[in-house]
Amino acid sequence: MLQAEMIVFVGVILWMCVFSQEPSSKVMADRYAVFWNRTNPRFQRGDYHIDVCINDYLDVYCPHYEDSVPEERTERYVLYMVNYDGYSTCDHTAKGFKRWECNRPHSPNGPLKFSEKFQLFTPFSLGFEFRPGREYYYISSMITETGRRSCLKLKVFVRPPNGCEKTIGVHDRVFVDDKVDNALEPRDDTSHEAEPSRSDVSTSGLRHQTSRPLLALLLLCISLYLLL
């Protein structure tokens, strides 16, 4: 009788361990890619905005060019985080501060990528903390070859918690890759890296799916050994 109860107990533990790894039961982070250049049609309309949740990521990709493109034809930007007035007038001097700098248009490792994590608290002195229900603004400006000032701006709204219930089963962009592929060292909680390849995402999902059967097999072997 004791052996039968042990088998039932081990079976319940095994079931809980396996199904607790199901993707549908996990709340994950989304990533939002923004290609920061004048040819992006979403910037041309002047109303580029995204809605995010706490712990989501914003990935800003800088302009990147082949070596054959001369320096004077490349785009370079300094991105600022500003208040609403700075966003409306595209002026970073009023309560704004520099966030990132796109200054390597010929980077050998591909386009520079700057990642912002929308988190409530940060352990870094140069990090930034975000609050649900508020808007945040990013801008950059440059003088074009025609002498006109080009202003690119982005509005980010952090949704309240009741609007952020999501699971991996209904969201596509959920793989968070903290690997730094480029040669820049982050000074805060901003990561600097080259554009990830599609293989990084697909292999990550494959490893996640294959780990569950292996875990089940391992637990089954342990339980059988204990019953002998």
Swiss-Prot record:
Pfam families: Ephrin. Residues 1-20 form the signal peptide. Residues 29-162 form the Ephrin RBD domain. Disulfide bonds join C62-C102, C90-C151. It is a lipid-anchor; GPI-anchor. Belongs to the ephrin family. Glycans are attached at N37. A lipid is attached at S204 (GPI-anchor amidated serine). It comes from the Eukaryota. Residues 184-205 are annotated as: Disordered. InterPro entries: Cupredoxin (IPR008972), Ephrin (IPR031328), Ephrin-A_Ecto (IPR034252), Ephrin_CS (IPR019765), Ephrin_RBD (IPR001799). This is Ephrin-A5b. It comes from Danio rerio (Zebrafish). Residues 205-228 form a propeptide. It is found in: Cell membrane. SUPFAM superfamilies: Cupredoxins. GO terms for biological process: axon guidance; ephrin receptor signaling pathway; mesoderm migration involved in gastrulation; positive regulation of peptidyl-tyrosine phosphorylation; regulation of actin cytoskeleton organization; regulation of cell-cell adhesion; regulation of focal adhesion assembly; regulation of GTPase activity. Keywords: Cell membrane, Developmental protein, Differentiation, Disulfide bond, Glycoprotein, GPI-anchor, Lipoprotein, Membrane, Neurogenesis, Signal.
